[in-house]
């Protein structure tokens, strides 16, 4: 995984564009589409160069945890610059996902990821234990519209569940958020993944960093997360799924549901096909930091 909030992050050179909140200030969705088309061009070019060089490290793939579509209404939240501001409608209109994922009828250019689902707008210091309380009106009019639009209109391929709890349950095991709303109501059939360490927050005890501690152990936490729709985690708790399977907390059929989604995503990125079949594999490396992008 990597991020591309305003350019391909971390993995070597890339064109750096303005921060997300500055791009939102243009109110120009067409400009954002063009910007993230350039970003995804560079992402694809860098990916295929890494493949040729046999470099398979983190930050060198095709999954980008972008955009951050949380609503920014408190200036004390230090990550507000990652977002598109305080307005749900403007956040919906920013054409980041379509620019990142491309328009080929068979292959996705990259995977975009809508984060952090849901009701996650800071503060950072207590997000691993915080239980969010919002009115139904605020949930549906403020915090969910951007996610719904990216699922229904943007065809976003990944959704990241947030660290915090909602109505007493961690977001990454929330049947209300993940099953009832995201999958059943909105018809989302693609990948749900956790933020880094989010599943550990279910069960891990840490005196320095209070956590949710809603589950007794890693196997219970991991099984609950998968059964409620979280296909993939960033972390190490899912190693306990083997034990959870042996203890009857989850079945192979349950695991296969998530496995199919994950493999489908890789097939649709063209990762198992020869480069000559994938149009995005033909993007030359010289687009990276090119004068046209600057």
Short names for language-model regions:
Residues 1-294:
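Glycoside hydrolase catalytic-domain context in secreted enzymes
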């Amino acid at each position: 995984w990597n991020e591309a909030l305003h350019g391909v992050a971390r993995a070597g050179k890339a064109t750096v564009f303005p921060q997300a909140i500055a791009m939102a200030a243009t109110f120009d969705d067409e400009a954002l589409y063009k910007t993230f088309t350039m970003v995804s061009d560079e992402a694809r070019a860098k990916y295929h160069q890494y493949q040729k060089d046999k470099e398979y490290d983190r930050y060198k793939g095709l999954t980008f945890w972008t955009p951050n579509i949380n609503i920014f209404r408190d200036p004390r939240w230090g990550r507000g610059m990652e977002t598109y501001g305080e307005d749900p409608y403007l956040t919906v209109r920013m054409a980041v996902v379509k620019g990142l994922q491309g328009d080929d009828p068979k292959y996705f250019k990259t995977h975009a990821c809508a984060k952090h689902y849901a009701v996650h707008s800071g503060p950072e210091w207590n997000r691993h234990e915080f239980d969010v309380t919002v009115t139904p009106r605020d949930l549906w009019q403020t915090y969910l519209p951007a996610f719904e639009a990216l699922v229904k209109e943007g065809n976003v391929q990944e959704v990241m569940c947030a660290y915090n709890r909602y109505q007493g349950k961690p977001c990454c095991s929330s049947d209300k958020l993940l099953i009832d709303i995201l999958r059943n109501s909105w018809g989302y059939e693609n990948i749900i993944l956790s933020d880094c360490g989010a599943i550990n927050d279910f069960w891990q005890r840490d005196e320095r960093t209070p956590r949710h501690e809603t589950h007794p152990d890693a196997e219970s936490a991991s099984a609950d997360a998968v059964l409620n729709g979280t296909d993939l985690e960033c972390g190490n708790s899912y190693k306990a799924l083997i034990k959870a399977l042996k203890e009857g907390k989850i079945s192979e059929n349950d695991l296969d549901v998530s496995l199919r989604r994950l493999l489908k995503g890789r097939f649709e990125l063209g990762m198992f096909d020869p480069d000559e079949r994938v149009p995005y594999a033909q993007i030359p490396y010289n687009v990276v930091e090119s004068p046209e992008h600057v």
